[in-house]
Regions:
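Low-complexity segments
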Residues: 23-39, 45-132
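Bacterial Sec-dependent N-terminal signal peptides
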Residues: 1-26
Length: 132
């Protein structure tokens, strides 16, 4: 019985550590990521709004490690190719912290953008109008 309880507790701990992020977390991460995209890629207001929604949808869809580079990641990148100009999309793909914004290591989710922009409270632009 003790062994079963131990296994269940370990399974629950593993499941909780790899759970999807909350809506609030996804919203904050999408805002930070999109703000830096707007700064580096010189996005217009319409592109900024659309990129925020795309990033938020992607972050909300990631529930497991398998989702990182699965269908929603491909949809995200395809959507980005529709809203960005050719030179912007090439720059987007060349920057790993934009192209693959999220990774999972040692049981935790990590955002590559923070290696380039460590000040998490500094924003270049205002919030998008769709930011609720």
């Amino acid at each position: 019985m003790k062994k079963l309880i131990s296994i269940l507790m370990l399974l629950m701990a593993f499941t909780m550590s790899s759970n999807a992020m909350s809506y609030e977390q996804a919203r904050q991460q999408a805002l930070f990521l999109t703000d830096k995209m707007a700064y580096e890629l010189n996005l217009t207001n319409d592109q900024y709004e659309a990129a925020y929604e795309i990033n938020l949808d992607y972050l909300m869809s990631v529930n497991t490690v398998d989702d990182l580079y699965g269908a929603y990641w491909r949809y995200r990148n395809l959507d980005m190719s529709y809203i960005l100009l050719d030179w912007q999309y090439r720059a987007f793909c060349d920057a790993a912290y934009f192209y693959r914004p999220l990774y999972f290591n040692a049981g935790y989710w990590h955002f590559g953008i923070y290696a380039r922009y460590p000040h998490r409270d500094y924003f270049y632009f205002d919030r998008p109008t769709v930011y609720i």
